[in-house]
């Protein structure tokens, strides 16, 4: 199901967060469950599709902002970066010091005002299931309700977001793609294209 929505909603957040704006120009992908609303910026989605079109296993980090209002978790994924120092495999997912150094260097250079929202993983030929290694890696490094996992699964390149619920990772069912000016991600992509082929 794809739906294009043009609206300007202002949501009241709980705590000290104040108000936040939902993106105006969005497109829904899949059926969302209502408890989480994941907004993926279009440049980020384009980058992840291209990066994960390679035949080898790859991982990336997701950056942006997390908000909570009226019992709903809002993930605004504004940026993503390839993790070049990691060699993911279905039975081997290591977030060592080299990975975190790379991630924090990228954050410092391109995405200073954003937080880590989770990670993305592509394991071509492995299938759609989340094995114990994937779940353990997520819970060890991205535990909590404010982090997500984005998987690109199988031959059809099915895109699925997962969040922590009930002691494990569960699919959110769908997400939203939104469109806005995204200079930090554009700068990252320009530098990546100049330095290496993705």
Regions found by a protein language model. Give the residues of each.
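N-terminal beta-strand/alpha-helix entry module and adjacent surface
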Residues: 1-118, 124-197
């Amino acid at each position: 199901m794809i739906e294009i929505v043009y609206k300007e909603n202002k949501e009241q957040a709980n705590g000290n967060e104040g108000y936040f704006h939902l993106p105006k120009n969005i497109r829904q992908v899949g059926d969302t469950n209502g408890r989480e609303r994941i907004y993926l910026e279009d440049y980020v989605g384009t980058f992840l599709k291209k990066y994960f079109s390679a035949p080898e296993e790859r991982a990336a980090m997701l950056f942006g902002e997390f908000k909570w209002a009226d019992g709903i978790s809002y993930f605004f994924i504004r940026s993503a970066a390839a993790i070049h120092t990691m060699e993911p495999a279905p039975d081997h997912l290591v977030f060592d010091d080299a990975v975190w150094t790379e991630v924090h260097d990228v954050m410092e250079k391109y995405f200073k005002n954003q937080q880590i929202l989770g990670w993305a993983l592509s394991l071509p030929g492995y299938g759609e299931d989340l094995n114990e290694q994937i779940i353990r890696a997520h819970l060890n490094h991205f535990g909590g309700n404010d982090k997500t996992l984005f998987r690109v699964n199988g031959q059809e390149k099915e895109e699925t977001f997962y969040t922590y619920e009930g002691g494990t990772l569960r699919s959110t069912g769908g997400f939203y793609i939104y469109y806005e000016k995204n200079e930090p991600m554009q700068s990252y992509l320009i530098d990546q294209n100049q330095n290496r082929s993705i």
